[in-house]
Amino acid sequence: MVKKIPTIIVLLLSLLSYSSYSQLQTLSGKKLNSEDLDKYIKKQMDSLAMPGLSFALINNGKVVYHRSLGVTSEETKLKVNDQSIFEAASMSKTVFAYFVLRMVDKKLLDLDTPLYRYLPYADIEKDERYKLITARMVLSHTTGFPNWRYFDKRDENLYKYGELYLKVTPGTEFAYSGEGYRYLSLVIAHLNGLSIQTLDPLFQKEVAVPLHMKHAWFSGNNYISNHKITGHVNGMVSKKSWPTSFPEQDSTWFDAAGGLHTEALDFSAFLIGLMKGKGISKSLVNEMFKEQVALDKKSPHYLVNGDTGWGLGIAIRPVSFGTIYEHGGNNGDFQSGFKINRANQNGYVFFTNCDKGAAFNNKIAELLIN
């Protein structure tokens, strides 16, 4: 005869199971209740008037909390869901850095070989100093390039509008630059017999598929067209459909500096793979997290974020319980951010379809880091 388990025991087991599920950790390892996190996030979204959000929390190398919240557009009021696609903006750089290190592991290029030896760059060839630029300099923002030639303030007596130039000699100081990533992406495409329009399939093969990033692309496709949500600036729907830094750029380009399209669950898969050291050699993983350049205390990254150095595609920030590795993204109408603690493999990542991401990041960090 089979004995029945008393109802009270069943209830207790259910409560214990629910309690363990809802008990989360901050990046330092402090306990956090999932219901409290729900309320906190909702409060921040309401106070900042954020339309939509994709958010994930990682504990011990696993996603333990994932939310798709808000609306895809303030006009249509359609709900954000788990298939909604956001712009990663500059968080693209961390993913591209990993892609580059995959190529280094394959001996296609060396971090310290000048890039012109692989592919001369006509855009800057009149300044011989560009021949000093290496992949390491690109990924640590020491190329000397401006962020973007079309947007940065330039000396109009020296450079025409749209002309690429060097602000400083390569390798001498930190100068955040998307232009460097542009050049390196051209090199990676060239070394693989591809173009900037045909590079994304290689990214899928080398990074997205192995790390189980089901929805993550640098170039446009039908899935993005059907699932990408709408950006917002100052509470108004943005008219921009694709992020661009060049007049001739369109969705076919592989934009290494800011073109990744994805959401929090898939980006978490990347962060988990990175923290676990999957896909690249241990020495290159360590190189990625190693400080390549110290930041000046007057740097905006130091003053605003507390970053003291830069690795390969990632910022380094000391905190009371160790070190946080982070990156943000800002395409204006889409913003994003992630922070990870490599020591305990805890972290978080978010995407929002508005210009309030930096403010949200500060608020969520108060709960999950400070």
Predicted regions and their residues:
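Short, gly/Ser/Thr-rich active-site loops of penicillin-recognizing serine hydrolases
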Residues: E291-P300, F351-N370
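A short acidic/small-residue loop/turn micro-motif
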Residues: G70-E74, G332, D355-G357
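Extracytoplasmic/secreted proteins, especially bacterial periplasmic and envelope-associated proteins
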Residues: L32, D36-K43, G52, S90, ...
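Bacterial Sec-dependent N-terminal signal peptides
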Residues: M1-S28
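Short, conserved catalytic-motif segment at the N-terminal edge
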Residues: G29-F86, L108, E156-Y165, G322
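Short, surface-exposed loop or secondary-structure junction motifs
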Residues: S73, K126-G328
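Short active-site loop at a secondary-structure junction
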Residues: L48-S54, E75-M137, L166-E179, D255-G258, ...
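Short, well-ordered beta-strand elements
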Residues: E326-H327, Q335-C354
